Amino acid sequence: MALLVLGLAGCARPTDRGQQYLDGEFDQVLNPVSTVSSDKPRDYHEFKQQMELVLERSPSMAATYQSLYRQVENWAENSGDPATLGNYGIDLAQMGGGDGYGNVMFTGYFSPVIELRHQPDATYRYPVYAMPKCGTSCPNRTAIYAGALDGQGLELGYSASMLDIFMMEVQGSGFVHFEDNDQLQYFAYNGKNGHPYVSIGKVLIERGEVPREKMSLKAISEWAAKQDDATVRELLEQNPSFVFFKPSSTLDVMGSAGIPLQAHAAVAADRKYLPMGSVLLAEVPQLDREGKWNGKHVLKLLMALDTGGAVKKNHLDLYHGMGHEAGIDAGHYKHFGRVWKLGLHGSLPAMP
């Protein structure tokens, strides 16, 4: 009966998360097309700063992409109409979407800011760890919480919230504020323990604690605020994976391409299809403050500059910036938009 219900539900094409059905069916992740037809409002202004950072910081990516970047910049400044991209020597490959109708999933990530102290006390007692020398036999989360890394000098600071540290692990990096000397520092990703990742959001859904349709980072935080420390710890221990950090000498938020990320211009992507530095034209779904699609998309230029373990094929993870509000916005995203990879004439679907 359950399978029958699911089958019947699948007959109606969903549109509640920004899905569109405008271009027929696709059978590949990247599908060469001759033109883009989009009447969405345009906003390309974040792309230029992201492009300049790539050209300044990465000679190798500059050598590969500079000609494309300048052509895209010329188009954005003098036309901006996606129907004219071919006039600027730019070819297109549309992403097929997980459903085969061009609906690419957008999720979001951000850089949290958490409060730390250099020394533990009765409140700030949960450590943030640097990478231990444990090779392929690193302890899992339960063992680490039980003290498996104690006495190794790996503590970078102490938080009052086990969940805050966990959320920084999920994002892969974040900012920390040491109130004892009013220092803001960026903690970059420094590796993980090699154990499999388990979604605590999925665990809460399966336990009936949070409805599937309301699941978000905000929903997890609200649930945790009502629990005692032992209950929160038990939930976090369902995920044996553990992320380690290293202090950065700058406040730049770096993606895996080694380039500072600009909010709403950088995405994590599957580098098998979108190598680092790839340029994307995307109809990005817009959400209201409650995290629901507001019926609109905005046409943006994006750049693939990061990766993620869960970001595969027709999935983009949009960087939202730093701080609490960015986290709320990013945590709501699991919506859809059309996406095209851009390349110089004759280059697609491969790299330009």
Q: Where is each model-derived feature located?
A:
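Sec-dependent signal peptide recognition
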Residues: 1-2
